[in-house]
Amino acid sequence: MSDSGGFDSHPHVALIPSAGMGHLTPFLRLAASLVQHHCRVTLITTYPTVSLAETQHVSHFLSAYPQVTEKRFHLLPFDPNSANATDPFFLRWEAIRRSAHLLAPLLSPPLSALITDVTLISAVLPVTINLHLPNYVLFTASARMFSLTASFPAIVASKSTSSGSVEFDDDFIEIPGLPPIPLSSVPPAVMDSKSLFATSFLENGNSFVKSNGVLINSFDALEADTLVALNGRRVVAGLPPVYAVGPLLPCEFEKRDDPSTSLILKWLDDQPEGSVVYVSFGSRLALSMEQTKELGNGLLSSGCRFLWVVKGKTVDKEDEESLKNVLGHELMEKIKDQGLVVKNWVDQDKVLSHRAVGGFVSHGGWNSLVEAARHGVPVLVWPQFGDQKINAEAVESAGLGMWVRSWGWGTELRAKGDEIGLKIKDLMANDFLREQAKRIEEEARKAIGVGGSSERTFKELIDKWKCNNNTH
């Protein structure tokens, strides 16, 4: 993009993420892309963060991009006991939502647009509508999950009884213009109508039609049918444009040369090509001791080499247990000849791009699945909570991976070690999946390349925001 026209011709875009690395990571990658497209960028932050990883991530980002303006949003005092939730990330979302009416001073001088996290949109929209400021949503899961989120308020309204309760008679939820979603795949928290998550889920779902557009970290080859249905207004009438801007690329600031990364890469260098299964359940989830034991036994029984990232606590500030305490001495001893187990932060992009890695066992977090798609690594998804079954379905439909519906949610402990081992063996030996994953890798490369679908979408957005400069 040319620099002609002077600095004032460049759009000025602000971004407000919420809590959790799964939300923060795509926001910072999007912000970096906006900088590279010569936008002025403001990042609205809240402190303290829930996890130490979030604080470090923001700090590294701001050091790498000094041209980005940080504006700190000071939240009102918040009593966690006033909300029907215990999850620390849900509680932080609610704390930001309750302070959203105070955002206006941070949204000046005039901006071209604000990009708001999906968890905050219903609370932030009244502010931006009052300021006549275009407000876009960054949806941090799959387009398939967005189809449920956007249509869910109407579905709930149609299922409500005279007493105010919601009754689902069927085993599936019908999504207009798309295949139905099994009721068993819907995030359990959404089904508890009294929970904080369910309330905000409905409020945010109702707000999409009032926004100016929805950005999703996906691309045409990964979710073509869903994206076509959404933009054809078949899912929800009056829905604004849905912009597939993925895969959002990792940035240099995310790559840290620390001893654990060097150890991992050296170990991978010594393994045959495509022989290692990488196992990671993301930044938020700590498996139960029982799950950890079954997964460890499954990895051993698979006979495959493996790199396993183990997490002990939900919030990293509390995670002080040693690997031996988490896994137990006996399992640690069995593992050491077949795999490498680490508890530190892992540069997932470097791992997935390594020639030795031939498969990925994942919880189904969308950022991880898109990274697997970008590197052409087939995935075995073991969903644990939230949107992850729906993400797993999207990955399976695209041909990138597999998931075992009978395992249910990971916390239900339906999967035993022997069965896990067999599925890992299937994953690593599946030539068809490997070919499909490589095809998707090539499509991902094309999408963000010159003239690719995501690159064109990005330019379309920036042109819209340039026009907004003339009206502010």
From Swiss-Prot:
Catalytic reaction annotation: a 3'-hydro-2'-hydroxy-beta-oxodihydrochalcone + UDP-alpha-D-glucose = a 3'-(beta-D-glucopyranosyl)-2'-hydroxy-beta-oxodihydrochalcone + UDP + H(+)
Transferase found in the keyword field: yes
CDD domains cross-referenced by the UniProt entry: GT1_Gtf-like
Coiled coil: none
UniProt temperature dependence: Optimum temperature is 50 degrees Celsius.
Region (UDP): 283-284
EC class of the enzyme, as a word: transferase
Keywords: Glycosyltransferase, Transferase
Residue positions of the active site: H23 (proton acceptor), D117 (charge relay)
EC number(s) from the headed UniProt entry: 2.4.1.360
pH dependency: Optimum pH is 8.0-11.0.
Molecular function in Gene Ontology: 2-hydroxyflavanone C-glucosyltransferase activity; UDP-glucosyltransferase activity
Tissue: Expressed in leaves and flowers, and at lower levels in immature fruits.
Name of one Pfam family that matches: UDPGT
Binding site for UDP-alpha-D-glucose: T140, V346, Q348, H363, W366, N367, S368, E371, D387, Q388
Residues where an anthocyanidin binds: H23, G386
Membership in a protein family: Belongs to the UDP-glycosyltransferase family.
Function: UDP-glucose-dependent glucosyltransferase catalyzing the C-glucosylation of 2-hydroxyflavanones (2-hydroxynaringenin and 2-hydroxypinocembrin) and phloretin. No activity with flavanones, flavones or flavonols. Exhibits C-glucosylation activity toward 2-phenyl-2',4',6'-trihydroxyacetophenone. Can use UDP-xylose as sugar donor, but catalytic efficiency is much lower toward UDP-xylose than toward UDP-glucose.
Name by which UniProt lists this protein: UDP-glycosyltransferase 708G1
Source species of the chain: Citrus japonica (Kumquat)
Classification lineage: Eukaryota, Viridiplantae, Streptophyta, Embryophyta, Tracheophyta
